[in-house]
Each structure stands twice: as structure tokens, then as C-alpha cells.
């Protein structure tokens, strides 16, 4: 055994370039497999985490209200109340395109939207200061708002100092009643996750001058029943509009499943490419071994004739 090992080492040392190229082929093949698999797993993890943070228990509804057939917020809430065994929260969504101001400072890229008192729970956010929008704020159309941490810091210096202050939204004065905790400390910037203002949706509807609300967000109590909940919503909307082109219902769990399928396909393709690289490296090693045996055929014969095993 020791003699064979010494002979192998001597053979490798005597063919340095050939040995180096052989090892290089194996190293490249193995490295390709490790790197590609690691990249895919890292990408998959980050994307899935990003989608999960958006809420896999959410169902988004977008409707097109026509003059002849429309869906008002009371109808949607009545449907929601009839199925509280399946749905967790509901929030209308009203986008308001406007500028916010405080004194001489203004912000033009801030996301301004109308939400319900349940939207904070839908997003899974927590308040750093103050309180959330309440049902009474919505019912009485109070000009109050909840702001993201970036807005509070940028216009008032801190979340604590922002509470109770006045914020001009589209020329109307709103009282800041709550500041949401930081969601993305690394991207606490203009247009980021923390750059938003939430108003009572009843007030936002008046500001947007839309007669009806076109967007809603539901959460489901059991994600395994997301498909059932989606079908239920679609049936309700079809009964209202009699035309399935006038609404679109999207379950986040479906998007996540579709994404996982695409990532699995990508992982398989990259794994196949890496496997081919390793196979090519293996063929190279076999080729070198065959060449080495061919070159030493005479030496092997002489050793055999002298009694070598």
C-alpha cells in the first residue's frame, strides 16, 4: 500500500502540468455546481421572503365601476360580514395623487392613500407613536392621518415630534395621529417603504373625486382556503356585474405558488448546466487516465515480467 502511494505521488510529481490541468477540471466542475446552486437558493429565498412580507394571506380585488352597474363600499362590507368565518380583515384602497406639505417643506413622491382601520393589521405593521385610524374617523370623515417613519423624520425630525402636528395633504390640513414603525431601515428614503400617508378611506374618496372605490384588500384566516375565498369573491362580483371582464381577483398565495414553480424550473436548468460542467470535467479526467495508462504500457509490462503485482 505504501509503495503504491509513493509511486502515485511520484507519478503526479513527474507530470505537474497534466496533474494540475486534471485537478483544475474537477475544481471548476465542483465550483460551478456549488456556485449555481447557492445563487439559485439565495435568489429563491430573497424573492419568497419578499412575497411573504407582502402577505400570502391577502386577496386583492380590482373592479371597474360603470354607471349602469356599480359596487359601493357598503355592499362589499356586507359581503365581508357574511363570511367572517373565512375572512380576517378588509380594507378599501383609494389612491390620492397629491403633494404633502409642512411649512415650506413639501414631498411629491409620497404614497398617499385611503385605508380602513384594519389596514395596519393587513400589512402586519406596528405603530411607533400614537394611534391607528379608527372606525369613527372613517364614519365621521375626520381629517386625521397615519404616516410612515420617513415622512415623520423628514418633515418633523422624529416620530414623537410628528404626533399631533398638522400635515397639508392636497391643500387640506390633516392631524397626524400615528406614526408606523420603520419597515426598512436600510432604505429609509424618498419613495421607499416608509414614505407613505394613510387617510380614512371615506375622506380619500372625496379628495379623489371618485364616486366609487375600485380596489379592496382581503385577508383570509386560513391560507389553505385561499382558493375557496377567491372563488367566493368572484361569484359575488359576477352576481353584481354579470360580466367577469369588469373585475379581477388575485390571491397572493397563487402568485407565490407560481413563483415557486418558476424558481424550481430555473433551479433544475442551472443544476443541469452545472452537472454538464462536472461531467465534462470527469471526461477530461478519464481521458488523462487513459493517456497515462497508454504511455506506461511498456513500463507496466516490464514490471509484470519482473514479478510485480
Where are these regions (language model features)?
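Bacterial inner-membrane juxtamembrane interface segments
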Residues: 1-309
Amino acid at each position: 500500500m505504501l509503495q503504491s502511494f509513493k509511486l502515485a505521488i511520484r507519478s503526479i510529481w513527474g507530470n505537474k502540468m497534466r496533474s494540475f490541468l486534471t485537478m483544475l477540471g474537477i475544481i471548476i466542475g465542483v465550483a460551478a455546481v456549488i456556485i449555481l446552486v447557492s445563487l439559485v437558493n439565495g435568489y429563491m429565498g430573497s424573492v419568497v421572503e419578499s412575497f411573504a412580507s407582502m402577505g400570502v394571506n391577502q386577496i386583492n380585488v380590482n373592479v371597474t365601476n360603470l354607471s349602469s352597474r356599480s359596487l359601493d363600499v357598503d355592499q362589499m362590507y356586507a359581503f365581508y360580514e357574511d363570511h367572517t368565518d373565512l375572512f380576517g380583515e378588509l380594507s378599501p384602497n383609494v389612491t390620492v395623487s397629491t403633494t404633502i406639505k409642512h411649512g415650506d417643506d413639501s414631498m411629491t413622491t409620497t404614497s398617499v392613500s385611503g385605508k380602513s382601520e384594519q389596514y395596519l393589521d393587513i400589512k402586519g405593521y406596528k405603530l411607533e407613536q400614537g394611534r391607528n385610524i379608527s372606525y369613527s374617523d372613517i364614519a365621521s370623515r375626520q381629517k386625521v392621518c397615519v404616516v410612515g417613519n420617513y415622512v415623520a423624520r423628514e418633515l418633523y425630525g422624529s416620530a414623537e415630534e410628528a404626533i399631533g402636528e398638522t400635515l397639508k395633504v392636497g391643500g387640506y390640513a390633516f392631524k397626524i395621529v400615528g406614526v408606523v414603525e420603520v419597515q426598512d431601515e436600510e432604505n429609509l428614503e424618498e419613495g421607499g417603504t416608509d414614505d407613505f400617508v394613510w387617510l380614512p378611506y371615506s375622506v380619500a374618496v372625496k379628495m379623489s373625486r371618485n364616486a366609487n372605490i375600485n380596489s379592496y384588500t382581503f385577508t383570509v384566516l386560513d391560507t389553505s382556503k385561499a382558493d375557496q375565498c377567491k372563488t367566493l369573491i368572484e361569484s359575488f362580483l359576477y352576481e353584481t356585474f354579470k360580466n367577469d371582464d369588469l373585475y379581477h381577483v388575485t390571491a397572493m398565495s397563487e402568485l407565490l405558488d407560481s413563483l415557486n414553480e418558476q424558481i424550481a424550473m430555473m433551479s433544475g436548468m442551472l443544476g443541469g448546466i452545472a452537472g454538464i460542467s462536472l461531467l465534462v470535467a470527469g471526461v477530461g479526467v478519464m481521458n488523462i487516465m487513459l493517456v497515462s495508462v497508454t504511455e506506461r504500457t511498456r513500463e507496466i509490462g516490464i514490471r509484470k515480467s519482473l514479478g510485480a503485482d
